[in-house]
């Protein structure tokens, strides 16, 4: 009976270690994904500024030529 309790306790201990390692790995993967999202937002911010500047310089000329009132 004592050996069975000892082996069950050992299996429980191994199971809890395994679960904690899986949880740490999952948290690391989530942090990795969150970092990619932040990087994408930063790239989008860098991209939107120059595009808006270009659009504001080209749009009035295009409208003027489109309506032929230049």
Curated annotation (Swiss-Prot):
Coiled coil: none annotated. It holds the Pfam family FSAP_sig_propep. Keywords: Amphibian defense peptide, Antibiotic, Antimicrobial, Cleavage on pair of basic residues, Fungicide, Secreted, Signal. Residues 1-22 form the signal peptide. Expressed by the skin glands. GO terms for cellular component: extracellular region. It is found in: Secreted. It comes from the Eukaryota. Residues 23-44 form a propeptide. The keyword Signal applies. GO terms for biological process: antimicrobial humoral immune response mediated by antimicrobial peptide; defense response to fungus; defense response to Gram-negative bacterium; defense response to Gram-positive bacterium; killing of cells of another organism. The keyword Thylakoid does not apply. Belongs to the frog skin active peptide (FSAP) family. Brevinin subfamily. Has antimicrobial activity against Gram-positive bacteria S.aureus ATCC 2592 (MIC=5.0 uM), S.aureus ATCC 43300 (MIC=10.0 uM) and B.subtilis (MIC=20.0 uM), against Gram-negative bacteria E.coli ML-35P (MIC=50.0 uM), P.aeruginosa PA01 (MIC=10.0 uM) and P.aeruginosa ATCC 27853 (MIC=5.0 uM) and against fungus C.albicans ATCC 2002 (MIC=10.0 uM). This is Gaegurin-LK1.
């Amino acid at each position: 009976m004592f050996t069975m309790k000892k082996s069950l306790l050992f299996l429980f201990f191994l199971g809890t270690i395994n679960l904690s390692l899986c949880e740490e790995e999952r948290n690391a993967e989530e942090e990795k994904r969150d970092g990619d999202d932040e990087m994408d937002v930063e790239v989008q911010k860098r991209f939107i500024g120059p595009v808006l500047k270009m659009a504001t310089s080209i749009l009035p000329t295009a409208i003027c030529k489109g309506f032929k009132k230049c």
